[in-house]
A protein has these predicted regions:
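A residue-level marker of the well-folded mature domains of exported/periplasmic proteins
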Residues: 1-120
Length: 120
């Protein structure tokens, strides 16, 4: 989670094998991934927060978590008696937990297509 160089090394290997778009969720390791992508002409989708501002030419979009929505969903499920132990819950787009954040590099037609696909 903390080894920036490891993230760069792994991304270098992936790009050398033909990857041109990387999606990584690994805290500081992701910074190494972004560095590698920038050096090698690849693109990155950030995760958990808006990482576009790190390098909007390289990080073309991010999947942003709405942690407030996560907490509200969890508390509402608990209060309703619907949150059970030993069970995995799949939450995300439907509950407005995840949302895409785009850089200017993403064309409007792609943003619209994704928005239409995300409607639930």
């Amino acid at each position: 989670w903390e080894d920036v160089q490891m993230g760069k090394d792994i991304a270098d290997q992936m790009i050398a094998k033909g990857a041109d778009l990387l999606f990584i969720y690994a805290n500081k390791v992701g910074l190494g991934c972004i560095e590698s992508a920038k050096e090698n002409g690849a693109k990155v989708i950030g995760f958990s927060e808006n990482q576009n501002q790190l390098d909007s030419d390289t990080v073309v979009a991010s999947v942003e978590f709405d942690f407030g929505a996560i907490y509200k969903w969890t508390i509402s499920q608990y209060l309703a008696g619907d949150l059970k132990g030993n069970k995995t819950y799949g939450i995300g787009i439907k509950e407005h937990i995840f949302k895409p954040v785009y850089s200017d590099a993403v064309p409007e037609e792609i943003k619209t297509k994704i928005a239409n696909e995300m409607k639930v």
